UniProtKB/Swiss-Prot annotation:
GO biological process: abscisic acid-activated signaling pathway; cellular response to osmotic stress; regulation of abscisic acid-activated signaling pathway
Keyword field: Abscisic acid signaling pathway, Stress response
Functional description taken from the UniProt entry: Plays a regulatory role in abscisic acid (ABA) signaling and tolerance to abiotic stress during germination. May be involved in the regulation of the ABI transcriptional factors.
GO CC annotations, alphabetized: plasma membrane
Species the sequence originates in: Arabidopsis thaliana
InterPro entries attached to this UniProt entry: GRDP-like
Expression induction: Up-regulated upon salt, osmotic, glucose or exogenous abscisic acid treatment.
Disruption phenotype: Increased sensitivity to salt and osmotic stress in germination and cotyledon development. Abscisic acid hypersensitivity.
Stretches that traverse the bilayer: none
Protein name, as recorded: Glycine-rich domain-containing protein 1
Domain of life of the source: Eukaryota
Gene it is expressed from: GRDP1
Length: 819
C-alpha cells in the first residue's frame, strides 16, 4: 500500500510541471493543420517542396522578423502561406537547431506569437498586402504551375540568411506522422486531456534522469508525442518551460528510424516503459496511442479533380429508409493482467487468466487467455475491439503440473468483472483504469482464506461508430466452392434470391436479379435488381441500361472504368458522392501482420474521393469470396450492397452486362502488382519510431486454448513456424488443421474442404468471410477470423518487445508478449 501511495505522489508531482501553453487547444489546431497538409501532398516531396523551402527562407522568416520589429507592420496577426507554414512547422520540430539558426541569422528566437494558422479560415488580406509590398515578384500562394528548379537553386544559393539544416529530410521524416494520429478518437477532449497529463509524466521521467545523471533515451507513445510536437511549435514557450524544468532546451531527436530489436529506439522504449511503470505504477502502453504500422500505400499520387459533376446530395431520396440498420459503437481495448495475490497456501499450478464479455457482441464474442506479469515475468497484452457495453469478465485458472502426458482440466479459482459502462457512460470520465479486483470463488473452492485478487490494467479509446457489416446468403442450400453462392446460369440465377443479413443474422432485405428470359415487361438483355423488404414491399433497386447500372432510381450509377494498369480502379459508383472500387485491400484495409491469412484477390476496396479527401478515403470493403460488405458510413449501405451484389454476380458469371472484367482478369492484374503481401513478423511498438521483432508461436501439442486459441477447439494447429492464423482460431472449431512446418496462414494443409469449419455466426472481429454457416466451407481463409477485433486474432510472443502498436490494432486483434 505504501508503494501505491508513492506512485500517487510521483504522479501528482509530475502534474505540477508548468506549461505556458494551452496544449489541449493547441493540439486540436495542430491536428487540423496536419490534416490540411495531408490534403496537399505536393508539400511532401518534389519541386513544390524545394520551392516551399526557398520561400520559407527568403520570404517568410524575413517577414516574421519585420513583423516583430516594426510597430507599423505588426498591427494585426500574420497568416503564413500554407507551404511556408509547413516548412516552419518541420523546422521548429528540431527545437535546438531552430533556436540556433534563429540566433545565428536574426539574433533571437522567432516565435509564433501573433501568428495565426493558414488553416483556420483567418483573414489573410493584411498579410497578403504586406507580402506583395515586400515581395512583388513572388505570389503569396505558391504557384504550382510555375516552378523552375534551376531558378530555385540559383536563388537559394544567393540567399545570405539560409539555414544549412536539411529541411527536405526533416519534411520526409515528419510526413508519416499524421497517419499515426489521424484516427477520430485522437481529437476527442478526454483523449487529449489524458495525453497532456501523460506528457507531463514523460517530462518528469526526463527530469528524474537528469537529476540522477542517468543517460536514457526516452521514447514517447503517439499521444505523448503529439503533445510534445505541439509544445515545440511554440518555440519561446517551449524554450522557457524546458530551461525552467531541466536547465536546457530538450532536444527532439526524430532522426532515428531503425526499429530493429536491440536498436536505440527499441531499447529506449523498453526502458521508458519500465521506468514509467516503476515510477507511477500505471501502464505506459495505451489504447489508441500505439504505432499503427507503416503508412499505407496511396491509391493515387494525383489529387482528385473536384470539378467532376456529382448528383445533388439534397435531392429527395425515396430509398433512404428502405432498410433499417442499427448503429453500433466500438472501442479499442488494451488489456494487461499485472498481478495476483492471496493464492491458496501450497498452490503449485501455473495460473493464467481467461477473459471474455458478459454480453458478447458482433465485434468480440470469444474467450481469450492472458498470462500474469508477476507470475511469468514478461509483459503480455491483448488488444481488441468491442462494443462499449456489458462487462469484461476475468476467470483465474490454474493448470497443475503433471508427469503423465494427459491433459488435465484447468482448475477455476474464481472470477471478477469490470464494467465498461462505468467508464464510458453517460459521460467518459477516464480512458484507463488499473485496480485490484477481488475474485468471487468458484464452486468448491476454499472460502476460509483471504479472497484472491487480480490486478488488471485496461485502457480504452473513446467510442466511435463501428462500420456496418452485411452478408449475402443465397437461398439455395448449395454451398460448394463458395460460402456466398454459386453463379450457375441466368435462368436459375433469376429465380434464386439472396438474403442480406446483418451481424445478428437478422434479415435486412432480399435481392433478386430479374432478366428478359423470365418474361414480363423487360426488354431484350435488360436486367433488374429487385429488392424485397421484411414488410413485403418490392422495389426496383437497379436497372442495367446497356452500358452501366443505374441504381436507386438513377440517384447512383455503377460502371466499369477502363483501367490502364492494375493499380487503377476497376469500377466507379457515382451519385451524390464519388466512389471508386479498387481490387484488393487498400489504405486502412491494407493488411499489416496477417497478410497471408486471406488473399487480396478476395477483396475490393471502396474509396471515396472529394475535395476534403482528394487522395481518397476508404468507405467500405467488399469480400468477393464470402459475399459481405463493410460500410463505414450509412449513406453507402444501400448503394454499396446493391453494387456488391451486382459485381459478385457479374464477375463470377464471366463478365457481361456492362462489365468485361472477370475474377480471372482481376487475379491476373493483381499478380502483376504483387497485391498479396508477405506476412510481417514485426509487432510495431510504441510511438514515434519503434517496431519490435516478434515470433508467432504455436503449441507443440493441441492443448485446448494454449498458444492463441479462442473459442471451443478440437485438435489445434500443429505448426513449427505457422504464420497468420496458424495458431489461432476463434469460434467453434471441429477437427482443426495439423499443418506442416512453416505453414502459412490457416490455408496450408486445408485444401478445399476443412471438415467442420468455423461456425461463422459466432465468429467475431474482422474475418469478413466467417459469417456463413457451412458444413464444408471452401478453404480456410474465412474460418479463422474471430478473436479480438480483426482478421486474425493471433497471439504473438515477443522477446524484448518494446510495445504493442500496429501489430495489435484493428486488423489483427493480436496478443503481444514482451519481456
Amino acid at each position: 500500500m505504501d508503494k501505491e501511495k508513492d506512485h500517487e505522489v510521483e504522479w501528482l508531482e509530475a502534474q505540477k510541471i508548468e506549461i505556458s501553453v494551452d496544449l489541449l487547444a493547441a493540439a486540436k489546431q495542430h491536428l487540423l493543420f496536419l490534416e490540411t497538409v495531408d490534403r496537399n501532398r505536393w508539400l511532401y516531396d518534389g519541386p513544390a517542396l524545394e520551392k516551399a523551402i526557398y520561400r520559407y527562407n527568403a520570404c517568410w522568416l524575413p517577414l516574421l522578423v519585420k513583423y516583430s520589429e516594426s510597430s507599423s507592420v505588426s498591427e494585426g496577426s500574420l497568416v503564413p502561406p500554407l507551404d511556408c507554414e509547413w516548412i516552419w512547422h518541420c523546422h521548429r520540430l528540431n527545437p535546438v537547431r531552430y533556436n540556433s539558426d534563429c540566433e545565428q541569422f536574426y539574433g533571437r528566437v522567432l516565435d509564433n506569437s501573433g501568428v495565426l494558422s493558414s488553416v483556420d479560415g483567418n483573414c489573410k488580406l493584411k498579410t497578403e498586402d504586406l507580402w506583395k509590398r515586400l515581395y512583388p515578384d513572388e505570389p503569396y500562394e505558391l504557384d504550382l504551375d510555375n516552378i523552375d528548379l534551376e531558378d530555385i537553386s540559383e536563388k537559394s544559393s544567393a540567399l545570405e540568411k539560409c539555414t544549412k539544416y536539411d529541411l527536405v529530410s526533416a519534411v520526409k521524416r515528419q510526413s508519416p506522422f499524421y497517419y499515426q494520429v489521424s484516427r477520430s478518437h485522437v481529437n476527442s477532449d478526454i483523449f487529449l486531456q489524458e495525453a497532456v497529463a501523460r506528457y507531463k509524466g514523460f517530462l518528469y521521467l526526463i527530469k528524474m534522469n537528469r537529476e540522477r545523471s542517468l543517460k536514457r533515451f526516452c521514447v514517447p507513445t503517439y499521444d505523448v508525442d503529439l503533445i510534445w510536437h505541439t509544445h515545440q511549435l511554440h518555440p519561446v514557450s517551449y524554450c522557457d518551460d524546458m530551461v525552467k524544468l531541466i536547465g536546457k532546451v530538450l532536444e527532439h531527436d526524430d532522426t532515428d528510424s531503425d526499429r530493429g530489436k536491440g536498436k536505440k529506439l527499441d531499447t529506449g522504449f523498453s526502458k521508458t516503459t519500465a521506468q514509467w511503470e516503476e515510477t507511477f505504477g500505471t501502464r505506459y502502453w495505451k489504447a489508441g496511442a500505439m504505432h499503427r504500422g507503416k503508412t499505407p500505400v496511396p491509391v493515387t499520387n494525383s489529387p482528385y479533380a473536384s470539378d467532376v459533376l456529382v448528383k445533388d446530395p439534397t435531392a429527395k431520396d425515396d430509398f433512404q429508409n428502405l432498410i433499417q440498420f442499427p448503429e453500433v459503437e466500438v472501442v479499442e481495448v488494451l488489456l494487461e493482467i499485472i498481478g495476483v495475490r492471496n493464492l491458496p497456501d501450497g498452490h503449485k499450478g501455473k495460473v493464467s487468466v481467461m477473459f471474455s464479455k458478459t454480453q458478447p457482441d458482433s465485434l468480440f464474442n470469444a474467450e481469450r487467455r492472458l498470462t500474469i506479469l508477476s507470475e511469468v515475468g514478461e509483459k503480455q497484452v491483448a488488444t481488441f475491439q468491442c462494443e462499449p457495453t456489458g462487462e469484461l469478465v476475468f476467470k483465474l485458472i490454474s493448470c497443475s503440473p503433471s508427469k503423465i502426458p494427459v491433459s488435465r482440466e484447468p482448475k477455476n479459482l474464481g472470477f471478477a468483472s469490470l464494467s465498461l459502462k462505468e467508464f464510458l457512460f453517460p459521460v467518459i470520465t477516464q480512458l484507463s483504469v488499473e485496480k485490484w479486483l477481488e475474485l468471487t470463488p468458484s464452486k468448491g473452492s476454499q472460502t476460509d482464506t483471504k479472497p484472491i485478487s487480480l490486478r488488471v490494467a485496461v485502457s480504452f479509446t473513446p467510442p466511435v461508430r463501428s462500420p456496418s457489416v452485411l452478408h449475402m446468403v443465397q437461398s439455395r442450400p448449395s454451398c460448394k466452392g463458395s460460402c456466398f453462392f454459386p453463379i450457375i446460369g441466368k435462368s436459375r440465377l433469376a429465380k434464386s434470391s439472396t438474403h442480406i443479413v446483418d451481424e445478428t443474422q437478422t434479415e435486412v432485405i432480399t435481392l433478386q436479379i430479374r432478366n428478359s428470359a423470365d418474361g414480363g415487361i423487360l426488354k431484350d438483355d435488360q436486367r433488374q435488381v429487385m429488392g424485397v423488404t421484411d414488410s413485403g414491399e418490392t422495389r426496383v433497386l437497379a436497372v442495367y441500361t446497356g452500358s452501366f447500372w443505374s441504381l436507386l432510381d438513377s440517384k447512383w450509377s455503377l460502371k466499369q472504368i477502363n483501367a490502364s494498369t492494375a493499380d487503377n480502379p476497376l469500377f466507379e459508383i457515382l451519385g451524390p458522392r464519388v466512389v471508386k472500387i479498387f481490387s484488393g485491400r487498400k489504405l486502412d484495409y491494407e493488411p499489416k501482420h496477417c497478410a497471408n491469412l486471406r488473399s487480396d484477390l478476395d477483396f475490393m476496396t471502396l474509396v471515396e474521393f472529394s475535395k476534403q479527401h482528394p487522395y481518397g478515403k476508404t468507405v467500405g470493403l467488399v469480400d468477393m469470396r464470402f459475399g459481405s460488405i463493410e460500410a463505414k458510413e450509412n449513406w453507402l449501405l444501400l448503394p454499396g450492397i446493391v453494387s456488391a451484389f451486382i459485381l459478385h454476380t457479374v464477375l463470377k458469371k464471366g463478365g457481361s452486362e456492362g462489365f468485361n472484367v472477370t475474377t480471372k482478369d482481376i487475379k491476373e492484374e493483381s499478380k502483376q502488382t504483387k497485391l498479396v503481401a508477405a506476412t510481417e513478423n514485426n509487432v510495431n511498438a510504441n510511438s514515434t519510431n519503434v517496431e519490435t521483432q516478434t515470433a508467432i508461436t504455436a503449441p507443440k501439442k493441441g492443448s485446448g486454448c494454449g498458444g492463441g486459441c479462442s473459442g471451443e477447439c478440437g485438435n489445434m494447429v500443429k505448426a513449427a513456424n505457422a504464420s497468420g492464423c496458424g495458431s489461432s482460431c476463434s469460434g467453434e472449431c471441429g477437427d482443426m488443421v495439423k499443418s506442416a512446418a512453416n505453414a502459412s496462414g490457416c490455408g496450408s494443409g486445408c485444401s478445399g474442404e476443412c471438415g467442420n469449419m468455423v461456425k461463422a455466426a459466432n465468429a467475431s472481429g474482422g474475418g469478413y468471410g466467417a459469417r456463413c454457416k457451412a458444413a464444408k466451407a471452401s478453404g480456410c481463409g474465412g474460418g479463422c477470423g474471430g478473436g479480438c477485433g480483426g482478421g486474425c486474432g493471433d497471439m504473438v510472443k515477443s522477446v524484448n518487445a518494446s510495445g504493442c502498436g500496429g501489430g495489435c490494432n484493428g486488423e489483427c486483434g493480436n496478443m503481444v508478449k514482451a519481456a
